């Protein structure tokens, strides 16, 4: 039973829950970006290049024989995946940059020194009076 309680304590910590939410949102964001690249960016880009569908771009290394499928290098799908990665990496970069800017602004905000208590003020005055008396006694 002890291990189960330890696991519960670990699983409900803020960092673990935050990480799980981040992974789920990241997976959903990845699907959105893949759709954006495949359905919105690549068709016009293929049209500009000459009516090319990037997902069909491939080099056939060995033709299909009977039930054995062809061996191909699907470089069009690779190009789409690279564009997916660049968009996701850029979005993450912009998010981290914004978070770092907010952290910097919080760190730069000046803090006012705490107001000394009445006891501290009294002790400071006594110290200053003793210093003055000691300076007056010295020849």
UniProtKB/Swiss-Prot annotation:
Pfam families: MscL (PF01741)
TM annotation in the entry: 9-29, 79-99
Physiological role: Channel that opens in response to stretch forces in the membrane lipid bilayer. May participate in the regulation of osmotic pressure changes within the cell.
InterPro entries with a match to the protein in the record: Mechanosensitive_channel_CS (IPR019823), MS_channel (IPR001185), MSC/AndL (IPR037673), MscL_channel (IPR036019)
Sample GO molecular function, one term: mechanosensitive monoatomic ion channel activity
Organism: Pseudomonas putida (strain GB-1)
NCBIfam families: mscL, PRK00567.1-4
Cellular component GO terms held in the UniProt record: plasma membrane
HAMAP family in the cross-refs: MscL (MF_00115)
Protein name: Large-conductance mechanosensitive channel
Subunit structure: Homopentamer.
Location (main, coarse): membrane
Subcellular location: Cell inner membrane
Family per similarity comment: Belongs to the MscL family.
Keywords: Cell inner membrane, Cell membrane, Ion channel, Ion transport, Membrane, Transmembrane, Transmembrane helix, Transport
Topological category with respect to the lipid bilayer: Multi-pass membrane protein
